[in-house]
A protein has these predicted regions:
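Short active-site oxyanion
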Residues: 1-3, 29-30, 61-64
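Phosphate-bearing ligand-interacting subdomains
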Residues: 37-98
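Short hydrophobic segments within beta-strands
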Residues: 6-7, 33, 67
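Short, solvent-exposed amphipathic alpha-helical segments in soluble enzyme
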Residues: 19-23, 80-83
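Glycine-rich adenosine-cofactor-binding loop
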Residues: 1-18
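NAD(P)-binding Rossmann-fold cofactor-contacting core
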Residues: 23-42
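Short, basic/aromatic-enriched C-terminal tail that caps enzymatic domains
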Residues: 200-220
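Structural signal for interior beta-strand "rungs" in well-ordered beta-sheet cores
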Residues: 92-206
Length: 220
């Protein structure tokens, strides 16, 4: 099975595909598709851009992975364009992920060491980055981006086009509605209305110019 990656903004996908192809010998990564000529100079670790998105119209035996995902709406636009070209979407699940009794929508990306517990459902074209845990019976919509080291507790309901940034966590039975953006290291203990931006709790300096004996109070 030949696979092309859409977009060059997430070169880490190369390593993820290599992990999978080490197990699935039929899988072959053949290169990137990108419409932006400014990306031609990107470092692609020995790989190359083989064409623009419309390349897929003439290579319909090739599966695609959409790696444009920081903006869920841009991801949807690219997906719809690819569907017009007749693209077939590859659902990427890293071999280290645990997902028995979970359902995963077409074209989604599940990265290293993710845990999707029984009863979890993931909509189409959603992205779950490394070391994220989604607990039992939680429902994740389509075109979502969930960052590294996120913990979603049981029976959460996550709408479509939601971004949950790295290190965030939720309480059980929470709902995050469509289009909301959750900042880094956020703690969600209530429902979040649609199209909200939840800010991160930035670190702050509490003391300066401390000597080592003073620092030891905070380290030990």
């Amino acid at each position: 099975m030949d696979v092309a990656v859409i977009g060059t903004g997430y070169p880490e996908i190369i390593g993820l595909l290599e992990d999978l192809s080490a197990i699935n010998k039929d899988l072959k990564f053949i290169g990137f598709l990108d419409d932006n000529p400014n990306n031609n100079s990107r470092k692609l670790y020995g790989n190359k851009i083989i064409g623009k998105l419309n390349w897929i119209k003439h290579h319909k035996d090739v599966y695609v992975i959409n790696s444009i995902f920081r903006n869920p709406y841009s991801r949807e636009q690219v997906t719809l364009k690819l569907k017009e070209f007749g693209a077939k979407f590859f659902t990427f699940i890293h071999p280290s992920a645990s997902y028995k009794y979970a359902s995963i929508g077409e074209g989604s990306i599940i990265c290293r060491n993710c845990i999707l517990e029984p009863g979890v459902s993931i909509g189409e074209q959603s992205v779950i980055l490394h070391n994220t845990v989604i607990s039992h019976d939680s429902k994740i919509g389509k075109y979502n981006f969930i960052g590294n080291n996120v913990t979603i507790q049981g029976k959460n309901l996550i709408g479509d086009y939601v971004t949950i940034s790295a290190g965030s966590s939720t309480c059980p039975n929470c709902e995050i509605m469509e289009g909301s953006l959750i900042g880094i290291n956020s703690f969600i203990n209530k429902n979040i209305p649609e199209r909200c931006i939840l800010g991160s709790p930035p670190s702050r300096i509490i003391k300066t110019n401390q000597k080592f004996p003073e620092l030891n109070k905070y380290i030990n």
